[in-house]
């Protein structure tokens, strides 16, 4: 996926990225940051305006990343009219798992060998004044509460379970993520086409 300002998918034949956009396939396959979040949100908003009846399919393979951009992707997924089918391939860790969880309930899928990881948000601001660090810690706690509530709403797990699990890195297989409520389905391998 190209990186940069949100790009509008034009209907020019032969351009692979545009073809994928026309098919409504998105590939957030990197660390979540402002640039990637803005691009994904821009594409989702464009696709929403283009046709509210066609669903959107982000294929997630992300090690996580920044919390605020990740939450903005989640919020955009809730805002658009078309259903968003999230598909986990590879790894959906940290904010990647939050984005995965944000797909339309019953339309969140993990491929058979996918991995999912949840944990609490971290702060990267350590070299400031004591007062700044306290304010940052308060903000991180607010973000943690917000992310915890997303998992509670989207998985059906009680608050105390999610809070306890977010205290550490919790890795899950595709079937474990399904049992946890992060995804609804685990794709099955097609063995008919194998030699």
UniProtKB/Swiss-Prot annotation:
Q: Which PROSITE patterns match?
A: CLP_PROTEASE_HIS (PS00382), CLP_PROTEASE_SER (PS00381)
Q: Which GO terms describe its cellular component?
A: chloroplast stroma; endopeptidase Clp complex
Name where it's found: Plastid, Chloroplast stroma
Q: Which UniProt keywords apply?
A: Chloroplast, Hydrolase, Plastid, Protease, Serine protease
What biological-process GO terms show up in the record?
Answer: protein quality control for misfolded or incompletely synthesized proteins
Q: Which InterPro entries match?
A: ClpP, ClpP/crotonase-like_dom_sf, ClpP/TepA, ClpP_His_AS, ClpP_Ser_AS
Query: Active-site positions, per UniProt?
Result: 94 (nucleophile), 119
Catalysed reaction(s) here are: Hydrolysis of proteins to small peptides in the presence of ATP and magnesium. alpha-casein is the usual test substrate. In the absence of ATP, only oligopeptides shorter than five residues are hydrolyzed (such as succinyl-Leu-Tyr-|-NHMec, and Leu-Tyr-Leu-|-Tyr-Trp, in which cleavage of the -Tyr-|-Leu- and -Tyr-|-Trp bonds also occurs)
Q: What Pfam families does UniProt report for this protein, alphabetically?
A: CLP_protease
Give the EC number(s) listed in the UniProt record: 3.4.21.92
Please report which protein family the annotation says this sequence is part of: Belongs to the peptidase S14 family.
What is known about its subunit structure?
A: Component of the chloroplastic Clp protease core complex.
Full protein name: ATP-dependent Clp protease proteolytic subunit
Could you tell me the gene encoding this protein? clpP
């Amino acid at each position: 996926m190209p990186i940069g300002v949100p790009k509008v998918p034009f209907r020019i034949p032969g351009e692979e990225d545009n073809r994928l956009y026309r098919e409504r396939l998105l590939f957030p396959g990197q660390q979540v940051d402002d640039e990637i979040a803005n691009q994904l949100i821009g594409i989702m908003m464009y696709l929403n305006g283009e046709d509210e009846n066609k669903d959107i399919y982000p294929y997630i393979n992300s090690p996580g990343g920044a919390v605020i951009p990740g939450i903005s992707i989640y919020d955009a997924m809730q805002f658009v009219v078309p259903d968003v089918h999230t598909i986990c391939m590879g790894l959906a860790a940290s904010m990647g798992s939050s984005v995965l969880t944000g797909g339309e309930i019953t339309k969140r899928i993990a491929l058979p060998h996918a991995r999912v990881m949840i944990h609490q948000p971290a702060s990267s601001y350590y070299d400031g004044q004591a007062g700044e660090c306290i304010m940052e810690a308060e903000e991180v706690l607010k973000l943690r509460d917000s992310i915890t509530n997303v998992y509670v709403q989207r998985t059906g797990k009680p608050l105390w379970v999610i809070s306890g699990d977010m205290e550490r890195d919790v890795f899950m297989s595709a079937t474990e993520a399904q049992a946890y409520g992060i995804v609804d389905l685990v794709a099955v391998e097609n063995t008919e086409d194998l030699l």
